[in-house]
Amino acid sequence: MKFIVKPHPEIFCKSDSVRKRFIKILDSNIRIMVKRVSESVAVYNRRYHIEVTANDDSDRDQILAILMQTPGIHHTLEVKQTEFKDLHDIFEQTLELVGEQLEGKTFCVRAKRRGQHDFTSIELERYVGGGLNQAVESASVKLKNPDITVRIEVDYDHLHQVLHRHKGLGGFPLGTQEDVLSLISGGFDSGVSSYLHIKRGSKVHYCFFNLGGPAHEIGVKQVSHFLWKKYGSSAKVKFISIDFEPVVAEILEKVDNGQMGVVLKRMFMRAAGQVAERYGIQALVTGEALGQVSSQTLTNLRMIDNVTDSLILRPLINWDKEDIIDIARNIGTEEFAKTMPEFCGVISKNPTIKAVKAKLEKEEANFDFAILDRVIEEARVMDIRDIEKQSQEQAPEIELVDQIGDGAIVLDIRSPDEEDESPLVIDGVEVKHLPFYKLATQFGDLDQDKEYLLYCDRGVMSRLQALYLTENGYGNIKVYRP
């Protein structure tokens, strides 16, 4: 079993020294990954292509999957390798392989050649094509858009008959570009933007701002590990988790409602910029798209960028959401994104679409930046390879109910603005209001002999907070979903 790996054409536009370096890195990346399949797999750097051979056909699917998902590969040829004597021998071997497939079909022959021979590539195509046309009476030659393209390559004294041509990922080999730090939330946008930078050759490290407890973190770890394992597992990268709940609580307490979204994004960038600087990472990557939400207007993005010296890359800036979802579906992150939470508490009621620097700075003057410094200092950093080892750690299940039992108290955890706008009133049931950002410090003050049903508009924040409280030893928690 043999595969011929063709590097992405852009690599050959580079100078000789850069091309050699890129192909050497690609060779190393392939070698690292296929050796996990079997130590018997051999990888050879042939200057303009890479050959991968294996003795055990049972490894084919795994090896092929790796090659199709490795950045820097344009396509992979799955070939049958033999020796040949002359042009007629090549024709006879080709006829034996494809003769039956050509019956009743149109076809053409495409040949490539390396080495010194007494025939040219065009002569090879004509000889083999003419012979096949005579040998298979029901077949006919068609040079444009044929039913079957017969591909053969002559490499010095070897004949490679192409069994299949598999499209690659394209882009540049992983590690040929500088590292980036992706601000990952687990949704459609951040997953796709991370993938695009992996494809372009950057080692992507992941920074997660945790707004919703362990369940959200588990989900984001899973999608980050999936992206790394499928497309970038030749690289060692970091997963950094920052508990941002104290920051959100401070924003909700101190910042004007209309400015909250932009201020929160500015806090993200301040924190991510410091993390990137700590690890020598040159740029931040976000999944923001122009105009998708209120904080993503040009004015607001400029205000967000101003708080860090790090370069901020937004590969999806002009993409439509539908196109982003299509890519997520193709790369395998759609299912993760569909189940990832959106938070109902950290949303301004009347968000500004044209933030003013002076007003932002005035609001941020009320913010205690010691809180931001503390959560950055306490950031948890792990090797992304260790996530798989933790896969057995599952968040506890939380019961969802639509009926309220006797004596149970409904705990409305929405923000004060949401609660004021749409008060929750249930006949015959006691409803208490305790904003989600105060649960960690004030839930213990409630009567623990009672059962509490957590409520929010979308049911996401309530479930995540219920998971958090359950993991902290409270067993009197359910989620109310009428």
UniProtKB/Swiss-Prot annotation:
GO cellular component: cytosol
Keyword field: ATP-binding, Cytoplasm, Disulfide bond, Nucleotide-binding, Redox-active center, RNA-binding, Thiamine biosynthesis, Transferase, tRNA-binding
Positions with a binding annotation for ATP: 183-184, 265, 287, 296
UniProt pathway annotation: Cofactor biosynthesis; thiamine diphosphate biosynthesis
Family per record: Belongs to the ThiI family.
Biological role: Catalyzes the ATP-dependent transfer of a sulfur to tRNA to produce 4-thiouridine in position 8 of tRNAs, which functions as a near-UV photosensor. Also catalyzes the transfer of sulfur to the sulfur carrier protein ThiS, forming ThiS-thiocarboxylate. This is a step in the synthesis of thiazole, in the thiamine biosynthesis pathway. The sulfur is donated as persulfide by IscS.
Protein name: tRNA sulfurtransferase
Species this chain originates from: Photobacterium profundum (strain SS9)
